[in-house]
Amino acid sequence: MLSKENKEYFRKLLSQRLEMLSAEADRPVSSVTHLKEESRDFVDQASMGSDTDFTFRLRERESRLILKVIEALERLDQGVFGICEECDREISVERLKARPIATLCIECKRAQEASEKVRGAQLPSYE
């Protein structure tokens, strides 16, 4: 069970991270992908399109991360923050400090990754 001090530490850390991510998400996309209207060069247009795609993928990733931070704060409120969703054991404080949105202990995360690796190796090759 997390100590009161650790709970306060993680609440502050997650709240700060949420504030930072929300500020990034509020930044207009056009400021990142501002394009000159007069540019008619095909290579420039392709490059700008690629930049726009990258920016939108980055925003999507930020949105998912915001949701994970909110979920971590909710787990803190519910008293289940730091408990592995797979085995119900405590997630180490060291792991939580490295990845405060973690929902799996390191052992369950390794098992999950190994399983995903095996499934990935079993996918048919289309080459």
Label for each model-derived stretch:
Residues 93-127:
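Short, Lys/Arg-rich amphipathic alpha-helical interaction segments
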